[in-house]
């Protein structure tokens, strides 16, 4: 028998029965016989055949396949050490960052990624000894480094709310502010705007989602917040027009950040 007893983004407590059947239990869950239960207070996430629970509080716990933003904190002979906001630092090996073979004796890895650089990577492996391996191969922007912009952190469990159904929330913020935004599943968000005011406005909207993610009508409130601030910026001459989404001010758009 295959059955799921909870909905995506449902708040659960330890011991909650999540599913029965041939599902794979991810982080924040445990299996007992044919059943999968929650081990933490958090929000349910269902990806294909994998069920996990994202804790409401605490540091980011990696899951293989997660797309994350990270900061280079050390450059070694054949790899980089990366901070992704997890309890343990991650590692990015040369072969997981570049397509071509390189001579490590003749190559300064700092010319690829240097300390302080922000990268966009995928969690390739996470084992029982807490070794986290990343890869930037196949990632947008070739994994980075991401130039300019600002890095904002939100609670990892709030990431699905920031993205919204079908990407609706994050795309509304991106369209109305004209900013480039990359959301990592570790709760790190990179924001790059056309000017400081629009970049700051996008960040304020992101932090508003983080603070109010548990409330009803959040999309409408964020939309009205953005439109109100954009009208002020237009009056001040900072912007010429207020962008349209789906043909009207502040409408929703679909897509993934």
Curated annotation (Swiss-Prot):
GO MF terms, alphabetically ordered: poly(A) binding; RNA binding
GO cellular component assignments: cytoplasm; exosome (RNase complex)
Pfam families in the cross-refs: ECR1_N_2, KH_6, RRP4_S1
GO biological process, one term: poly(A)-dependent snoRNA 3'-end processing
UniProtKB keywords: Cytoplasm, Exosome, RNA-binding
S-S bonds: none
Cellular location(s): Cytoplasm
Family to which the UniProt record says this protein belongs: Belongs to the RRP4 family.
Name assigned to this protein: Exosome complex component Rrp4
Organism: Thermococcus kodakarensis (strain ATCC BAA-918 / JCM 12380 / KOD1) (Pyrococcus kodakaraensis (strain KOD1))
Gene: rrp4
């Amino acid at each position: 028998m295959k059955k799921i007893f909870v909905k995506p983004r449902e708040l659960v407590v330890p011991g909650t029965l999540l599913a029965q059947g041939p599902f794979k239990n991810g982080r924040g869950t445990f299996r007992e016989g044919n059943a999968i239960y929650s081990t933490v207070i958090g929000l349910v996430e269902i990806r294909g055949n994998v069920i996990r629970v994202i804790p409401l509080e605490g540091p980011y716990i990696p899951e293989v396949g997660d797309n994350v933003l990270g900061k280079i904190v050390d450059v070694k002979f054949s790899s980089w050490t990366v901070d992704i906001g997890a309890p343990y630092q991650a590692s990015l090996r040369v072969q997981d960052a570049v397509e071509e073979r390189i001579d490590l004796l003749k190559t300064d890895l700092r010319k690829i990624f240097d300390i302080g650089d922000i990268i966009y990577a995928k969690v390739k492996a996470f084992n029982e000894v807490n070794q986290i391996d990343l890869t930037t191969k196949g990632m947008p922007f070739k994994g980075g480094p991401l130039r300019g912009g600002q890095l904002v952190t939100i609670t990892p469990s709030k990431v699905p709310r920031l993205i919204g159904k079908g990407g609706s929330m994050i795309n509304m913020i991106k369209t109305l502010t004209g900013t480039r935004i990359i959301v990592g599943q570790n709760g790190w968000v990179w924001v790059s705007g056309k000017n400081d005011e629009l970049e700051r406005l996008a960040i304020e909207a992101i932090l508003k989602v983080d603070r109010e993610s548990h409330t009803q009508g959040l999309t409408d409130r964020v939309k009205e917040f953005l439109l109100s601030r954009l009208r002020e910026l237009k009056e001040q001459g900072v912007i010429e027009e207020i962008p349209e989404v789906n043909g009207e001010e502040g409408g929703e758009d679909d897509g993934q950040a």
